């Protein structure tokens, strides 16, 4: 079993959306050896459910997010793969835990997009655009993890 964590600032918009989408894609592809989490680097939303905009877009696409609440990325977290939404998140993760054991990426490294950062829809209100960015990256991320961790698909 490998652990993957998506990380954004508040863990109410981008990273929980990515967690829910990734879980759905893993289910669709019948992959059971990847456990998905999400975390935030800021503590002001701890214990809160995903943002209303994230909930709406996930509901629109019939992707469950039951029981998800905001959690903080901590130095003691031990994830195999850590997937940040933007460069600021990468910097914060490295500051929180300068001795990371897991592999650290930005999500859009697994997309075909020119952008390198997933914009925060908390400020842009573009939840649909973020959904598209996350969805376009998840299968490539899954392919990478399956190969890297020598997992079975199906």
UniProtKB/Swiss-Prot annotation:
Tree of life domain: Bacteria
Keyword Phosphoprotein on entry: yes
InterPro entries given in the database record: LMW_PTPase, Ptyr_pPase, Ptyr_pPase_sf, Tyr_phospatase_low_mol_wt
Transmembrane feature ranges: none
Enzyme class, UniProt record, top EC level: hydrolase
Keywords in alphabetical order: Hydrolase, Phosphoprotein, Protein phosphatase, Secreted
A single cellular component GO annotation: extracellular region
Reactions it catalyzes: O-phospho-L-tyrosyl-[protein] + H2O = L-tyrosyl-[protein] + phosphate
Subcellular localization: Secreted
Regulation: Inhibited by N-ethylmaleimide and sodium orthovanadate.
One example GO MF annotation: protein tyrosine phosphatase activity
Active site: 8 (nucleophile), 14, 120 (proton donor)
pH dependence comment: Optimum pH is 6.2.
KW Secreted (keyword) present: yes
Entry comment on modification after translation: Phosphorylations at Tyr-122 and Tyr-123 are essential for phosphatase activity.
Principal cellular location given in the protein's record: secreted
Temperature curve summary: Optimum temperature is about 40 degrees Celsius.
SUPFAM superfamilies reported for this sequence: Phosphotyrosine protein phosphatases I (SSF52788)
The enzyme's E.C. designation: 3.1.3.48
Homology family: Belongs to the low molecular weight phosphotyrosine protein phosphatase family.
Function text: Secreted tyrosine phosphatase that plays a critical role during infection as a bacterial effector protein that counteracts host defenses. Required for intramacrophage survival.
Subunit structure: Interacts with host CORO1A.
Protein name per the record: Low molecular weight protein-tyrosine-phosphatase PtpA
Species name: Staphylococcus aureus
């Amino acid at each position: 079993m490998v652990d993957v964590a998506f990380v954004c600032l508040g863990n109410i918009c981008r990273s929980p959306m990515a967690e829910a989408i990734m879980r759905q894609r893993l289910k669709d592809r019948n992959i059971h050896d990847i456990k998905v989490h999400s975390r935030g680097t800021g503590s002001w939303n701890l214990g809160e459910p995903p943002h209303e905009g994230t909930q709406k877009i996930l509901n629109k696409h019939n992707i469950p997010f039951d029981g998800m609440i905001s959690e903080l990325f901590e130095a003691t977290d031990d994830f195999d793969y850590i997937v940040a939404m933007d460069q600021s998140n990468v910097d914060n993760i490295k500051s929180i835990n300068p001795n990371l054991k897991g592999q650290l990426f930005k999500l859009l490294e697994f997309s075909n997009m020119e952008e390198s950062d997933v914009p925060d829809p908390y400020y842009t209100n573009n939840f649909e655009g973020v959904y598209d960015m996350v969805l376009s990256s998840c299968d490539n991320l899954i392919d990478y993890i399956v190969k890297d961790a020598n997992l079975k698909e199906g």
